[in-house]
Amino acid sequence: DITDKEIELVSDALRSGWITTGPKTKEFEKKLAEYIGNEKAVCLNSATAAMEMTLRVLGIGEGDEVIVPAYTYTATCSVICHVGAKPIIADVAKGRHEMDYDNLDRLVTEKTKAIMPVDLAGIICDYDKILKLAERNKDKFRPGNDIQKGFGRLIIVADSAHGFGAL
């Protein structure tokens, strides 16, 4: 339930004159960094914006491929298209909503830069299997810049918008 306290806090934020970033955002970023055990956190207006920013920082773009699950939200594929890369759709496992981990290897090519698993509806992907896939396909990985070279394998860009805080 939304209480009067929450309504008051939102009203205070709106009256402060800070429409986007500001003291409340900085306070939230600090608390979020502590919660996830990191030194810093950056908050954007959506997971869509965060995923696109991540792909751009990684230098993923024209001519690159990113593997995504067939069962996901449209933003998973649209951010890949926005940066000029090509989404490669991985089928889901029979009877589940997750990617079929056993059939991902055949999707990896020398153009594949990343895999973007989706923690849909709070169901966390099997990141151990995904990491093993990335390690197994190191020989196909062709880094396009120093950041990608630093990974030395397929980059895992987790879309955890639905899985944030899930264990």
Label every PLM stretch briefly:
Residues 56-160, 165:
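PLP-dependent aminotransferase-like
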